[in-house]
Structure formats: structure tokens, C-alpha cells
């Protein structure tokens, strides 16, 4: 059986490794530990996705509920509960999930990856080299770039972390003249403040003065002063990291695949990083299974992964663009001006339009492989809809175009009829006295 090596043990790499194990593949994963102790705010949807991917140990004691405050465009409100994910605990749990699933986990830094006709040679610091028939690149933003992809405005996030007094768990986000800040406080007193700024327009001081510069920014924020209180902020640790949105130009070949931030990394305002990583990774085991066991479908499998990643990236990017556009006070400031129009002017969620529906053959996931099937292309789903609650909709829509709807529904069970009628209405269908006469 093919030797598969996954590089990176974040959510994306772990999800792919676990998915491959469920398909019966032996998997080796190579990773080094994070260089800083991060905290991430995630939604219930993200926690559910992590559990569905089999990451149970990763979530044990790693997430604490918090009511998030929002101060945006001069308006304050409390949003839904978010969960603060302690990344060091989460990452330790990920490795435990992997080991329990039978994944060989190697701790070490990858020095080089060399490809040849025989596969891959992976050199690891302090260890013997590995050989692989198939490579999964999941090292996030640290993955080597592959040519010039789509990039958003150059952005950097400055994370400040310090130990405060124990208290209640809380989190907040606010827009600022030259960027935006996310802040969090854990019950044990660990405090986090992350300021995201524009690389080209903000003149940041040198590293020696950067901590004080960040401190002055917090002092100028009424929300931050209230959130963290007047207590001293001793021994603040600073970590700067790129948060520019990046889409890799190619994310899949015949014997390799990129997932998570290595495939697409988006602005942290556009959505949660963990969820974005999972979004591009959960489909990867089936893509890999197809490439290895049905090589005649290689082009179809590559097309499936490439298009899914591209559409996910654009959807997240447009969501972030709309958040930036909501801030009206500093429209002309470089940070806000650059981000309120990128990546394009296309709406994030297109309105339903029954007249715009069409049917095309597209790649789908069927029985553990990428296959081709007729799907319904909609304004909001350019990759198509194959099933709705288990009901294949393209054949039924073809009949709706040429037959009375009641005749189409007559062949369905009551539950299927309810599902299909609901889907038709959601796509803008309105009953009319005569059929449209449209062909498919």
C-alpha cells in the first residue's frame, strides 16, 4: 500500500490523517510544536466540525465558553457565545487523537522535501529521512510557496500575551483607525490582545520599541482599558505573524495535495482559522483515495479539490470584505480602503434566481471516491448541488422544467416531496398555472 506522509499536525493535517486511517491507509505525520502559545475564538459550529473529524481528545478541556463583545463602526453589542480554544492544549490533544488512531507521529522539523520519479524524500532534523509515495502539505503559512497565487492586502497581526489576575473568561473585538483588535481573557488570568494592521501604511517601530507601541495603542482604546482593567501588564510576550489572505495557485497534483492554510489562508476577520483549515481538509482523504486507487480519475479529483479550495477562499474573502465595509468612520484610511473592495465586488451570498438554475456534470464525492454526476448550478453555489437531504435534485429539476410540479412530486414519498418543494422555493421557484417549457 502507498506510503503517505502528512507534513503538519494542525487541524487540517490531523483531519486528513484521521480520514486516511479510516480508509485503511497507513499514515506517517511529521510536525514540530508551535513557537507561541496562541488562543483562538471558535463557534459551536467549529467544535461540531472538529468532533465530526474525530478530534475528541483535542477538544477535551481545550475550549472555554465566552460572551464576545463587539465594538464596530462606533456601535457596541454582545454577540453569540464563542469558545476560547487554548492552542497548546488543543495541539497536544490532536497528537493524542492521531496516536490513538494508529498514525505514526514524528516530532521534528522538516529540513527539505525532494521529489523524484520514485516519490518523495523528506529530511528531518535529527532523524533518518523518510520516503513517501504521496505527500500531504499541511504546514500552514510555513509551507513553501508554489508560484504566485492570489494575495490580499499585505497584513500583519501583532499578538501580545501576558499574565494578569485570575477572573472571568471574556473576549471582544473592536475596529480601530488603523486596523482592528481581538482581545481575550482566560479565567486563569492569561490575557491576549492581537492588533491586525496594514503592512504598507502603518510605520511600526523596531522590535525593541514595538511592545511599548502596542501598549500605547491599548491605552488609547476605551474598550481595551475597560476589558483588561488598570492592573500592570508585566512581561508581555510579542509575536508578529503574517495574516495576509493567500490562495495557492495549485493545490493538488497526482501524488501531492495541499490542505488548510497551505492551500488557502484567509484574513482572520473573514472567519475562524480552524474552520477554514477544516473546510479544505475534510474532502482531501477522498481525493487522495481517488488519486491512488482510481488514477484514471486523477484530473477529475484534482479539479474537484482545486475548485473547492478556490470557491471557499473567495467566499471567506468576500465575507471579510463585507465586515470591513461595515466600518464607515475611517473609509479613507489605507487599511480600510484597501479591504472594503477586495477581492472583488461580487456579493458574498447571491440571491436565489430560479431562472438562472442550470444543470451540468461536475465532480462529486461518491462511495469514497471522486466521481462525476449532474448537479444543479445556482447563483450562490457555482460548484453545484447534488443532493438535498439525500435526494438527488438534478433529475427532478429537469422534469420540473417540462412537466407540472404535481406530476414530479407524485413519484416521491411524502418526506421527499416536502424536502424537494422546500428546496424549489428556496431557489426562487413560484408556482405558475403553466409549465415553463424549459429544457435541461
Name the predicted role of every residue range.
Residues 337-399, 418-433, 437-440:
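Acidic, low-complexity/disordered tracts enriched in E/D and polar residues
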Residues 77-97, 202-206:
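Short beta-strand to alpha-helix junction loop
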Residues 99-229, 247, 264:
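Predominantly flavin-linked oxidoreductase catalytic cores and closely associated redox partners
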Residues 33-69:
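N-terminal FAD cofactor-binding segment of flavoenzymes
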Residues 1-12:
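Beta1/beta-strand and adjacent pyrophosphate-binding region of the FAD-binding site
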Residues 112, 129, 207-321, 328-329:
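FAD/FMN-dependent oxidoreductases across multiple families
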Residues 9, 18-39:
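Glycine-rich FAD pyrophosphate-binding loop
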Residues 303-359:
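Mid-to-C-terminal Rossmann-like scaffold of FAD/NAD(P)H-dependent oxidoreductases
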Amino acid at each position: 500500500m502507498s506510503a503517505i506522509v502528512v507534513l503538519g499536525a494542525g487541524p487540517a493535517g490531523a483531519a486528513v490523517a484521521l480520514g486516511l486511517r479510516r480508509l485503511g491507509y497507513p499514515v506517517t505525520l511529521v510536525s514540530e510544536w508551535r513557537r507561541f502559545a496562541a488562543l483562538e475564538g471558535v463557534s459551536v459550529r467549529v467544535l461540531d466540525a472538529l468532533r465530526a473529524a474525530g478530534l475528541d481528545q483535542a477538544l477535551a478541556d481545550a475550549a472555554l465558553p465566552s460572551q464576545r463583545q463587539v465594538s464596530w463602526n462606533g456601535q457596541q453589542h454582545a454577540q453569540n457565545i464563542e469558545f476560547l480554544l487554548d492552542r497548546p492544549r488543543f495541539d497536544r490533544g490532536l497528537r493524542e487523537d492521531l496516536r490513538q488512531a494508529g498514525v505514526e507521529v514524528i516530532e521534528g522539523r522538516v529540513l527539505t522535501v525532494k521529489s523524484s520519479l520514485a516519490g518523495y524524500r523528506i529530511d528531518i532534523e535529527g532523524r533518518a529521512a523518510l520516503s513517501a509515495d504521496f505527500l500531504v502539505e499541511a504546514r500552514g503559512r510555513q509551507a513553501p510557496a508554489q508560484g504566485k497565487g492570489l494575495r490580499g492586502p499585505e497584513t500583519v497581526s501583532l499578538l501580545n500575551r501576558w499574565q494578569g489576575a485570575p477572573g472571568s473568561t471574556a473576549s471582544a473585538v473592536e475596529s480601530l483607525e488603523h486596523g482592528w483588535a481581538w482581545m481575550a481573557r482566560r479565567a486563569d488570568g492569561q490575557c491576549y490582545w492581537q492588533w491586525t494592521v496594514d503592512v504598507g501604511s502603518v510605520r511600526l517601530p523596531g522590535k525593541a520599541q514595538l511592545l511599548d507601541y502596542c501598549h500605547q495603542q491599548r491605552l488609547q482604546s476605551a474598550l481595551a482599558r475597560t476589558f483588561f482593567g488598570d492592573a500592570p501588564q508585566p512581561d508581555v510576550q510579542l509575536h508578529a505573524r503574517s495574516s495576509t489572505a493567500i490562495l495557492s495557485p495549485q493545490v493538488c497534483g497526482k501524488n501531492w495535495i495541499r490542505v488548510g492554510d497551505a492551500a488557502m489562508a484567509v484574513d482572520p476577520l473573514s472567519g475562524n482559522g480552524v474552520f477554514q483549515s477544516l473546510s479544505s481538509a475534510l474532502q482531501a482523504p477522498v481525493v487522495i483515495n481517488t488519486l491512488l486507487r482510481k488514477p484514471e480519475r486523477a484530473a477529475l479529483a484534482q479539479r474537484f479539490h482545486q475548485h473547492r479550495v478556490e470557491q471557499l477562499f473567495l467566499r471567506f474573502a468576500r465575507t471579510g470584505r463585507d465586515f470591513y465595509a461595515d466600518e464607515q468612520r475611517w473609509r479613507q484610511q489605507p487599511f480600510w480602503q484597501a479591504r472594503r473592495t477586495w477581492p472583488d465586488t461580487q456579493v458574498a451570498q447571491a440571491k436565489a434566481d430560479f431562472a438562472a438554475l442550470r444543470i451540468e456534470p461536475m465532480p462529486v464525492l461518491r462511495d469514497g471516491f471522486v466521481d462525476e454526476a449532474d448537479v444543479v448550478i445556482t447563483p450562490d453555489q457555482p460548484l453545484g448541488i447534488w443532493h438535498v437531504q439525500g435526494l438527488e435534485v438534478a433529475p427532478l429539476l429537469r422534469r420540473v422544467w417540462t412537466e407540472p410540479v404535481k406530476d414530479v412530486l407524485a413519484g416521491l414519498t411524502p418526506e421527499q416531496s416536502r424536502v424537494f418543494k422546500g428546496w424549489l422555493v428556496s431557489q426562487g421557484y413560484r408556482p405558475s398555472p403553466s409549465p415553463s417549457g424549459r429544457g435541461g
